[in-house]
From Swiss-Prot:
Transmembrane segments: none annotated. It is an enzyme of class 2 (transferase). It catalyses: RNA(n) + a ribonucleoside 5'-triphosphate = RNA(n+1) + diphosphate. It comes from the Bacteria. InterPro entries: DNA-dir_RNA_pol_omega (IPR003716), Pol_omega/Rpo6/RPB6 (IPR006110), RPB6/omega-like_sf (IPR036161). The keyword Isomerase does not apply. Pfam families: RNA_pol_Rpb6 (PF01192). This is DNA-directed RNA polymerase subunit omega. The RNAP catalytic core consists of 2 alpha, 1 beta, 1 beta' and 1 omega subunit. When a sigma factor is associated with the core the holoenzyme is formed, which can initiate transcription. Keywords: DNA-directed RNA polymerase, Nucleotidyltransferase, Transcription, Transferase. NCBIfam families: rpoZ. SMART domains: RNA_pol_Rpb6.
Length: 75
């Protein structure tokens, strides 16, 4: 992956695992819904690349969750 660089992405998101999770969820959203693009121009033509470009631009960020929250799949 040449653009955006991993170093640029690490400045926005604290861990590689959070970055992968965030980008994959955003890529899935872009694939399922039309006209959800947040940037005017993308370098990548693929959804994951577009999601990573949004992270590098600071448009897509990680929202911290309350650690005491229990989800259905954790029961």
């Amino acid at each position: 992956m040449l653009y955006p660089s991993v170093d640029a992405l690490k400045k926005e998101i604290d861990s590689k695992y959070s970055l992968v999770s965030l980008a994959s969820k955003r890529a899935r959203q872009m694939q399922e819904e039309q006209n959800t693009e947040r940037l005017h121009k993308y370098v990548s033509h693929k959804y994951v690349g577009k999601a990573l470009e949004e992270v590098a631009a600071g448009v897509l960020t990680k929202v911290s969750q309350d650690e005491s929250t229990v989800y259905e799949d954790e029961i």
